[in-house]
C-alpha cells in the first residue's frame, strides 16, 4: 500500500496581542491625580511638571489639571499637567 510520509509541522502561527500603548489623555484634556496620560516602552515622552513615571515608563497625573505636551530644543517631548488655577489664568 502507498503511504504518505508524515509532513513537518508549520513554524508559523504565533501572534501576540497588541499592548494598547500610546497616549490616553491628549493635550488640553482634564485629568485627576492617578489618571494615566501615556503608556509606552521606553521614554518616548518624558515626565514634566506634576507628572510621574511608573516602573514600566507609564506617565500619570499627580494633580488635577490639564495635560500639556511641550517639545524641547533637544528633541525631547515633555508632558506636564497644569493645575486648574494656573490653566484658568493663562
Curated annotation (Swiss-Prot):
Keyword Phosphoprotein carried by entry? no
Residue stretches spanning the membrane: none
The reply on keyword Ribosomal protein is yes
As for family, the record states: Belongs to the bacterial ribosomal protein bL27 family.
Which cellular components does GO assign to this protein? Answer: cytosolic large ribosomal subunit
HAMAP family from the xrefs?
A: Ribosomal_bL27 (MF_00539)
One Pfam family this chain carries? Ribosomal_L27
Q: Which GO terms describe its molecular function?
A: structural constituent of ribosome
Q: What is this protein called?
A: Large ribosomal subunit protein bL27
Superkingdom, taxonomy of origin: Bacteria
| Species this protein is from | Rhodopseudomonas palustris (strain BisB18)
| Segments for region (Disordered) | 1-20
Q: Which GO terms describe its biological process?
A: translation
Keyword terms of this UniProt record:
Ribonucleoprotein, Ribosomal protein
Note the NCBIfam families from the entry: L27
- InterPro entries tied to this protein: Ribosomal_bL27 (IPR001684), Ribosomal_bL27_CS (IPR018261)
Amino acid at each position: 500500500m502507498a503511504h504518505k510520509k508524515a509532513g513537518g509541522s508549520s513554524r508559523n502561527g504565533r501572534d501576540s496581542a497588541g499592548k494598547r500603548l500610546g497616549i490616553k489623555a491628549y493635550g488640553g484634556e482634564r485629568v485627576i491625580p492617578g489618571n494615566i496620560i501615556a503608556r509606552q516602552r521606553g521614554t518616548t515622552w518624558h515626565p514634566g511638571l506634576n507628572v510621574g513615571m511608573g516602573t514600566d515608563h507609564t506617565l500619570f497625573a499627580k494633580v488635577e489639571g490639564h495635560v500639556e505636551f511641550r517639545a524641547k530644543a533637544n528633541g525631547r517631548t515633555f508632558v506636564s499637567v497644569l493645575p486648574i488655577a494656573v490653566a484658568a489664568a493663562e
